[in-house]
């Protein structure tokens, strides 16, 4: 018996060691199927676990007691307050699906647990509770000096910087509106910085929102946006701008366009307020983003053995659906220039705009040095006033709705929506191009960087539509799907009004988008284990009841600034344009079709591009970035472009993202203490660009991880992405699987079952030109040549379709 117990104990110890190693396996130069990447913290902290009530089951396993009534068991990453708790304060451990552990979380999305008023925290924060007129006056003078003294040097058209600025573009009117909003936020931030300096407020108090001083009784109160009055909280249709989704009056702006991002962890701003992260853990300056990019993120061709470019392209459409940031602008709405012409040098402090964070290029740079480039333009993101009208750190603006609601198709405002509608039969406006429906051409001269290319640029619900031709392809597909559905509804209900047909078609297309996202796309990205743990798997029948009025659906800085940028690694540097029988007809370098959509006017190109997306493999998500993005991004007619990898690293620092190690801790996993925990080649490269593992940028660290089982990203990105899509589901009252007790526009049971039939393959068939595309792979995100993924004819009854008879009145 003792021998058996010894063997069982040995097995437990071995399992713990393997789990800890697996969680931080670093990606090699090939795609490996790896063991389950369970975060090891609950198992590793045996002393802590022994204090929690558990009930024994059989053999080696123990089953935790359920959480108390009203308290949910969530993954550690969804209970961020645990990071700041002592071991005896940690929440009760509980069981999650797939054999995982979580916390019985009582603190929700808050970064800290409530503290008693007599705690040292409250005592230390014994500063004034109101803003004095002296502080307000001085802050106002500082702000006006900053605004009036700023250099008004714009980016010139035709340069890569100009094209990069278009990723923040919506309309000229919106750009000026966002300029005013951001200035209001900057004045509040400057007031916060001055108050903090004068009162010597600890950084910790700012980053944890422990400075309960309001702007409401000051001249800055007009910068605060009051929640809208929601006249009909039971509206069947969601609003265009995302307002009034949450039924609580003080939360009616949650998830709406123009609202700030949330954070999983407090920011790493150096002053706790808005100064970018610029120093390593030992106080020395962080190395430049371009140096890290060229050292760690080289271009290596690693085609994914299973998944295709449709994963990359659908992922970008989804990214544009849920987020669009804005860069700080000049007074006339022009883009800010931080470098001299052609990037020869960074502008002097006297000439430089306060929002400049130029990326330094070293003289020995193997690419940019050939062109004399020493500076890449980079401008900080626009801010939005804190929703609680309180002294706080800088919060980044998102211009579109935070929900998965097909906003690239419909826009994120009533005005944008009206510009897209035909106002006949519930349809969207389209351009008839010799019998093919394409998006209408735009009148916006800033939609494309080149005036010549701009003549064929398209108009949609999102200002970034023309960014790359594959994106335009899916935008056309979704617009066509709306009109197909609207036409079918009109045939079924000929007396229905244009407004009813439009809103019903929109409601159906949004549901289709959500179902494809959660049923087909997301499992590929994060793997089946995370889908189960975060309750993201769509039901086969019946309604979900996961809505939580306390969940803010806003995107997080960590998701926007790092984890979801994993898609940049999946981009191939070229499109292999394939004709009907799979023959490669043309190879197109992606920089040549950025903001240059003219090829879409070729009769067969739309079908050929769809075929390319489902046939050509995506690149593996790893530490390799295509040179099309790291050297030639938005080059236009120039011999060089920008470096997207360097931009991503710099953007994380601009947003105050914490280091990679901090997010390991948030997941409940051990921090890295040595570069030697990575494979030797990567460890050597890391040691050349970072002082310690505590300095590794989140985006970089996430790309170095080995993919989770059944997914394409590592465990850290998988957790951050899973958390985000849980927010989108739990915080969206109009999510397609909710019944009418939650969702005023709920589908009836028959309609919901029809929605569950939709697949991306069906949408490809229904909305292709059928010129060269007659069949599709049954699993549209899987390579057409992958074993078991047979091609199926578009007219084959075995390809499911949504029967819209369920919508007959």
UniProtKB/Swiss-Prot annotation:
Residues the record lists as binding heme b: 568
Propeptide residue range(s): 22-223
Record InterPro entries: Haem_peroxidase_animal, Haem_peroxidase_sf, Haem_peroxidase_sf_animal
Presence of keyword Ribosomal protein: no
Marked site (Transition state stabilizer) residue numbers: 464
Signal peptide: 1-21
Family membership noted in the UniProt record: Belongs to the peroxidase family. XPO subfamily.
GO biological process: one example: hydrogen peroxide metabolic process
Effect of disrupting the coding gene: Females are sterile, and maturing follicles show defects in actin filament formation, nurse cell membrane stability and border cell migration.
Residue positions where N-acetylcysteine is found in the record: 224
PANTHER family in the cross-refs: CHORION PEROXIDASE, OXIDASE/PEROXIDASE
EC number: 1.11.1.7
Protein name: Chorion peroxidase
Entry's Gene Ontology cellular component terms: extracellular space
Binding note for cofactor: Binds 1 heme b (iron(II)-protoporphyrin IX) group per heterodimer.
Subcellular location(s) per record: Secreted
Pfam family, one: An_peroxidase
Cofactor(s) it depends on: heme b
């Amino acid at each position: 018996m003792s021998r058996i117990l010894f063997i069982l104990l040995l097995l437990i110890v071995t399992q713990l060691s393997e789990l800890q190693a697996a969680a931080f396996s670093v990606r090699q130069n090939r795609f490996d199927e790896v063991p389950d990447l369970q975060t090891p913290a609950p198992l590793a902290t045996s002393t802590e676990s022994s204090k929690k009530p558990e009930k024994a089951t059989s053999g080696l396993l123990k089953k935790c007691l359920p959480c108390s009534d009203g308290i949910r068991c969530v993954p550690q990453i969804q209970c961020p307050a645990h990071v700041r708790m002592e071991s005896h304060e940690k929440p009760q451990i509980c069981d999650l699906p797939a054999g995982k552990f979580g916390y019985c979380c009582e603190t929700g999305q808050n970064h800290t647990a409530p503290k008693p008023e007599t705690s040292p925290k409250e005592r230390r924060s014994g500063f004034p509770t109101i803003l004095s007129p002296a502080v307000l006056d001085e802050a106002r003078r500082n702000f006006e000096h900053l605004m009036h003294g700023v250099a008004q040097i714009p980016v010139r058209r035709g340069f890569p910087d100009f094209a990069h600025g278009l990723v923040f573009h919506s309309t000229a009117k919106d750009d000026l509106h966002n300029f005013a909003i951001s200035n209001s936020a900057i004045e509040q931030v400057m007031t916060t910085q001055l108050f903090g300096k004068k009162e010597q407020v600890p950084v910790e108090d700012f980053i944890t929102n422990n400075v309960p001083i309001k702007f409401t009784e000051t001249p800055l109160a007009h910068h605060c946006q009051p929640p809208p009055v929601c006249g009909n909280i039971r509206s069947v249709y969601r609003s265009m701008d995302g307002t009034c989704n949450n039924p609580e009056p003080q939360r009616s702006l949650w998830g709406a366009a123009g609202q700030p991002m949330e954070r999983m962890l407090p920011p790493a701003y150096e002053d706790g307020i808005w100064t970018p992260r610029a120093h390593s853990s030992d106080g020395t300056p962080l190395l430049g983003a371009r140096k890290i990019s060229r050292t760690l993120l080289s271009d290596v061709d690693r085609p994914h053995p299973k998944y295709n470019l449709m994963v990359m392209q659908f992922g970008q459409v989804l990214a544009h659906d849920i987020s669009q940031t804005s860069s700080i602008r000049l007074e006339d709405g022009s883009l800010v220039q931080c470098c001299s012409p052609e990037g020869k040098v960074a502008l002097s402090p006297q000439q430089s705009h306060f929002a400049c964070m130029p990326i330094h290029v070293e003289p020995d740079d193997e690419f940019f040095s050939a062109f004399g480039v020493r500076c890449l333009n980079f401008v900080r993101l626009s801010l939005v006033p804190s929703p609680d009208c309180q002294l706080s750190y800088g919060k980044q603006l998102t211009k579109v709705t935070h929900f998965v609601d097909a906003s690239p198709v419909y826009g994120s405002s009533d005005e944008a929506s009206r510009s897209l509608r035909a106002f006949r039969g519930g349809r969207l406006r389209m351009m008839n191009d010799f019998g093919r429906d394409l998006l209408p051409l735009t009148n916006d001269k800033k939609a494309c960087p080149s005036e010549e290319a701009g003549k064929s640029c398209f108009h949609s619900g999102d200002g970034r539509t023309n960014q790359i031709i594959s994106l335009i392809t899916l935008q056309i597909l979704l617009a066509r799907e709306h009109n197909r559905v609207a036409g079918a509804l009109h045939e079924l209900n000929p007396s229905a009004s244009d407004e009813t047909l439009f809103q019903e078609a929109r409601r159906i297309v949004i549901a289709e988008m959500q179902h494809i996202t959660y049923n087909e796309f997301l499992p590929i990205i994060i793997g089946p284990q995370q889908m189960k743990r975060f309750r993201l798997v769509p039901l086969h029948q019946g309604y979900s009841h996961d809505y939580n009025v306390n969940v803010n659906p806003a995107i997080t800085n960590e998701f926007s600034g790092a984890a979801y940028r994993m898609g940049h690694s999946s981009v191939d540097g070229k499109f292999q344009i394939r004709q009907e029988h799979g023959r490669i007809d043309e190879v197109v370098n992606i920089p040549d079709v950025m903001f240059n959509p003219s090829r879409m006017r070729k009769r067969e190109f739309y079908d050929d591009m769809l075929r390319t997306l489902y046939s050509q493999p995506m690149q593996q998500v790893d530490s390799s970035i295509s040179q099309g993005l790291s050297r030639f991004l938005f080059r236009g007619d120039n011999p060089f472009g920008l470096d997207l990898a360097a931009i991503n690293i710099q953007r994380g620092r601009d947003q105050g993202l914490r280091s990679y190690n901090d997010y390991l801790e948030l997941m409940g996993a051990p921090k890295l203490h040595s570069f030697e925990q990575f494979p030797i080649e990567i460890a050597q490269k890391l040691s050349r660009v970072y002082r310690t593992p505590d300095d590794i940028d989140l985006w970089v660290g996430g790309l170095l991880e080995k993919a989770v089982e059944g997914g394409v990203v590592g465990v850290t990105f998988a957790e951050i992405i899973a958390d985000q899509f849980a927010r989108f589901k739990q915080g969206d009252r109009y999510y397609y699987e909710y019944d009418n007790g939650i969702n005023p526009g709920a589908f009836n049971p028959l309609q919901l079952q029809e929605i569950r039939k939709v697949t991306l393959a069906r949408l490809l068939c229904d909305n292709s030109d059928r010129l060269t595309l007659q069949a599709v792979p049954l699993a549209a995100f899987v390579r057409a040549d992958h074993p078991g993924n047979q091609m199926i004819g578009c007219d084959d009854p075995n390809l499911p379709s949504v029967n819209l008879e369920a919508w007959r009145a």
